[in-house]
């Protein structure tokens, strides 16, 4: 990735349970990127992820597939996160805006502020007003900036982890050696078994 490349993270903001009712279309994130390019007057060279946890790990991949763009192998958190100012992009000093948000009906809003905490409050308010879930392009940066701020190799790591867990079925003790090998070569560090159990039920509230 060239240092002067224009990189834009894209993803969803809001309550994940709402997206089960307001299902995003395949090209929703790519439409946001189209609008974002018109807003800033510059073509996007690559997309990135806000967070590797949850649905936001997939939205950049969907947008990239539709647009034919590369995806940065990394994200802004290394896991899921609750607020924008907690991203490594923000911590590294990357300005959150200009940002463009779109709801399920195609209504859009543009945000401009240099303070990420203020941006977080405003973008959440728009998400709430829009029914609980929106798609956003934000934290535009150069290739040099994302190299300095991204949590690296989390996309490829997730693919390897998913493949391992899909192929290695059985007791956790049988899988642990391969898990330890995989994690040892990642940003996450070593794996420790704390307990073994089975999820029997869950209760999700929004």
Model-derived features: where do they sit?
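A short, small-residue-rich loop immediately preceding and capping a beta-strand
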Residues: 43-56, 70-72
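Short, acidic/small-residue loops that bind anionic groups at enzyme active sites
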Residues: 66-85
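Conserved anion/nucleotide-ligand pocket segment
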Residues: 105-155
């Amino acid at each position: 990735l060239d240092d002067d490349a224009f990189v834009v993270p894209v993803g969803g903001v809001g309550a994940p349970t709402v997206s089960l009712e307001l299902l995003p279309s395949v090209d929703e994130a790519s439409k946001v990127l189209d609008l974002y390019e018109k807003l800033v007057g510059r073509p996007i060279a690559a997309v990135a992820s806000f967070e590797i946890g949850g649905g936001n790990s997939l939205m950049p991949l969907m947008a990239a597939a539709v647009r034919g763009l590369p995806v940065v192998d990394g994200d802004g958190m290394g896991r899921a996160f609750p607020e924008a100012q907690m991203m490594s992009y923000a911590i590294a000093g990357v300005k959150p805006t200009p940002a463009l948000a779109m709801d399920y009906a195609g209504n859009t809003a543009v945000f401009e502020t240099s303070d990420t905490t203020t941006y977080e409050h405003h973008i959440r308010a728009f998400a709430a007003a829009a029914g609980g879930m929106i798609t956003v392009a934000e934290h535009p940066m150069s290739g040099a900036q994302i190299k300095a701020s991204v949590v690296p190799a989390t996309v490829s790591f997730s693919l390897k982890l998913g493949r391992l867990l899909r192929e290695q079925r059985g007791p956790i003790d049988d899988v642990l050696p391969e898990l330890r090998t995989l994690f040892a070569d990642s940003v996450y560090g070593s794996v420790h078994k704390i307990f073994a159990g089975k999820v029997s039920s869950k209760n999700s509230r929004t």
